[in-house]
Curated annotation (Swiss-Prot):
InterPro entries linked to this entry: Choline_transptr-like
Gene: Slc44a5
Parts of the chain that traverse the membrane: 33-53, 237-257, 261-281, 320-340, 346-366, 369-389, 455-475, 510-530, 605-625, 644-664
Protein name: Choline transporter-like protein 5
Short name of any one Pfam family annotated for the protein: Choline_transpo
Keyword line: Antiport, Cell membrane, Glycoprotein, Membrane, Transmembrane, Transmembrane helix, Transport
Keyword Plastid applies: no
Protein family membership: Belongs to the CTL (choline transporter-like) family.
GO cellular component terms, semicolon-separated: plasma membrane
């Protein structure tokens, strides 16, 4: 009888014993060449896009305010060099609903050297000017350059050369904002409660505040940006010191893991629980303190987010909410520890094995610096290109009508010939104002497409840099594992060799994997963009769909990242293309699914606690410093607008630094584990086919009952 063939397994066939296999394959060929060529062409196109944006863009358009003629205020070498402030002819038009759509007030705007200091209408100026000519000299500085005195208000409305009235204002981010002074709780300009705006209409303080808020909403982001820059300029030395402390702590923890993994594991746990407990205690103190004050709950309103942020930390609800959130995190960590208590010993042994590998390959701890440099280059290039693309083009002028009832509204116009057209006659009050920077050329028509290209290229390059690091580290740690006599059998310069192999042979495969991940992330960005566009509609079905898509893409991204990491390990080991490596890694994990659940969950959780502990220690020190509670340091920053800005920067920066160091550790543990699974399938522990795994790791897994001898 013929012998029946065994059907192929749905989980793939186990590895067979190969006496010649001694770690990462030396003889390789280039993989995924087509994807490599596409990737290189894509980078070339990205470079050309950057040069094109550099040639057409002008970042000054974001730094200087622009008048209605499209000229910069305060720019050196121009007639507006000494006119650094933007003045609005009719600030009440900034309350128009269409203003937020155009991001521009539908009123004439000119550059002036100073803001008005008194309330004065044009008619009052005419009357007073008969006795004192200085009134016209004062008023004309808020008019157009060619303005001349007119006799009637009708002539003034037709010419549009001067505002109907000027109000006491103060410069705010190079804009003249009405000076609203609080007198006995009532908002008043100067000392008037109601007044005429020069056109016969009576205005109230509420209208004034709405107009000021309208302008504030337009420039709010730039306001916060400047204040943030000021805070960074004040505290940058302390931020660098804090990041250095985070780097030293991360390095110290990695070294200590080699000798005291068990002790450090419990130190991570109790350290994180202690820091969160301190946060709960501090939030409770602030909550109790504010609760004893009268009027601790109030409605927040004012000029943009600056006022709201300042009030935010004076609300008892703020501290109560943060206390609840921290308490929930504390409880979740304790529950997770209870469920994972039986697997902690496995994680400790894996951490010790990872520490041994890193001690033999100390250059692995320096590799995050290279990753940081490459990521910084990618982020900087993306940001600069985005700014230059956003500021490309020439000034575009459009017809703006305050009433919004004109057939010519939003049509392009030329400010030089606009007064001689029929538009001012057909639409009284219409003006030809600067709207935005753009153009009608092919380049300007594709600005949005270029921005999308810029974002996708950024995501692709970021993921490629991370993939390159993972593949290089995997190759180095695989060389360590498959050395029978450590460190004698470890090849020289394993990290440098693995990095060279990855770049020379597997650029296409790494680009392929990073392309898949970048595509998923791009879809997430598109979903978020659509959600922001649909939020105002308050459509329940659309919101439900968004939540479902967001959840699906989040799960998909996590799954792709997990498969990519293991695929890069297989690429580093065998040098196959991305699809074959992904298939082999997936089958290997599926054949050993129980062992995967033992290691990954606990090990990653321990490393996460280490990152949180590093950022938490630096965060507590930063909080004490920036709130002047650290009495040891007397020269700390004391003039910060928002102390939480450098504080959050330090916490986030410390976490990213710790993530950079601990990601090396994570890749080390994952590579050792994949190699361990390969080792179990290739060998049997006999003298002729010995295991490469260390006895400590083998014994702990045997004790857990996860490995059964063949």
């Amino acid at each position: 009888m013929a012998r029946k063939r065994k059907p192929p397994s749905s989980q793939g066939d186990p590895r067979r014993y190969d006496p010649d296999f001694q770690g990462p394959t030396a003889k390789r060929t280039c993989t995924d060449v087509l994807c490599c060529l596409i990737f290189l062409l894509f980078i070339l196109g990205y470079v050309l896009l950057g040069l094109l944006a550099w040639a057409h863009g002008d970042p000054r358009k974001m730094a200087y305010p622009t008048d209605s003629q499209g000229h910069f205020c305060g720019q050196k070498g121009t007639p507006n060099e000494n006119k650094t402030v933007l003045f609005y002819f009719n600030i009440f038009r900034c309350t128009s609903p269409s203003m937020m759509l155009r991001l521009q007030c539908s009123t004439t705007q000119i550059c002036v050297s100073r803001c008005p200091e008194r309330f004065l209408t044009y008619l009052d100026m005419q009357f007073l000017n008969k006795e004192d000519k200085n009134y016209w000299e004062y008023y004309r500085q808020f008019c157009k350059a060619k303005a001349k005195p007119v006799e009637t208000l009708r002539d003034l409305l037709i010419s549009g050369d001067c505002p109907l009235a000027v109000y006491p204002s103060r410069p705010f981010l190079q804009r003249c904002i009405p000076d609203l002074s609080a007198l006995n709780g009532t908002w008043t300009p100067g000392s008037r409660m109601k007044f005429e705006d020069g056109s016969g209409q009576t205005r109230t303080m509420l209208e004034f505040r709405e107009a000021a808020n309208g302008i504030s909403d337009l420039i709010n982001a730039r306001t916060i940006g400047l204040k943030l820059l000021e805070d960074y300029a004040t505290s940058w030395k302390w931020i660098l010191i804090g990041l250095t402390v985070a780097m030293a702590l991360s390095w110290t923890f990695l070294i200590l893991l080699r000798f005291t993994a068990g002790f450090l594991f419990w130190f991570f746990i109790f350290g994180v629980l202690g820091i969160i407990g301190y946060g709960i205690w501090y939030c409770f103190l602030e909550y109790s303190s504010i609760q004893q004050r009268p009027q601790s709950t109030f409605w927040m309103y004012g000029f943009g987010i600056q006022r709201r942020v300042n009030m935010f930390f004076h609300l008892k609800e703020t501290w109560f909410s943060m206390m609840i959130i921290l308490s929930a995190i504390e409880i979740i960590i304790i529950i997770v520890l209870i469920f994972l208590r039986t697997r902690i010993q496995v994680a400790i042994i894996l951490l010790q094995e990872g520490s041994k590998a890193i001690s033999y390959l100390p250059s692995a701890l320096i590799y995050p610096v290279l990753t940081f440099i490459l990521l910084s280059i990618c982020i900087s290039y993306w940001a600069v290109t985005a700014v230059f693309l956003a500021t490309s083009g020439v000034p575009i002028f459009k017809v703006m009508v305050p009433a919004g009832q004109c057939i010519y509204e939003d049509e392009t116009c030329d400010p030089e010939i606009f007064p001689y057209t029929n538009i001012p006659k057909d639409c009284p009050g219409a003006s030809c104002n600067f709207a935005f920077y753009g153009g009608r050329s092919m380049y300007h028509n594709y600005i949005l497409t270029f921005q999308v290209y810029n974002l996708f290229a950024f995501l692709w390059l970021i993921n490629f840099v991370i993939a390159l690091g993972q593949c290089a580290l995997a190759g180095a740690f695989a060389s360590y594992y498959w050395a029978m006599k450590k460190p004698d059998d470890i090849p020289p310069y394993p990290l440098f060799t693995a990095f060279g192999r990855a770049v020379r042979y597997h650029t296409g495969s790494l680009a392929f994997g990073s392309l898949i991940l970048a595509s998923v992330q791009m879809f997430k960005v598109i979903v978020e963009y659509l959600d922001r566009r649909l939020k105002k509609a308050q459509n329940s079905a659309a919101q439900f769909l968004h939540c479902c898509l967001q959840c699906c893409f989040w799960c998909l991204e996590k799954m792709v990242k997990f498969l990519n990491r293991n695929a890069y390990i297989m690429i580093a080991l065998y040098g196959k293309n991305f699809c074959e490596s992904t298939r082999d890694a997936f089958y290997l994990l599926m054949r050993n699914i129980l062992k995967v659940t033992v290691t990954d969950e606990v090990t990653y959780f321990v490393l996460l606690l280490g990152k949180v502990l590093v950022s938490g220690i630096v965060g507590v020190l930063a909080f004490l410093l920036f709130t002047e509670r650290l009495q040891i340091i007397v020269d700390g920053p004391t003039t910060l607008n928002y102390y939480w800005v450098p504080f959050l920067t330090l916490v986030f920066g410390s976490y990213m630094i710790a993530h950079g160091f601990f990601s090396v550790y994570s890749m080390c543990v994952e590579t050792i584990f994949i190699c361990f699974l390969e080792d179990l399938e290739r060998n049997e522990g006999s003298p002729s086919r010995p295991y490469f795994v260390t006895p400590a790791l083998m014994n702990i897994l045997l004790e857990q009952g996860k490995i059964k001898k063949q």
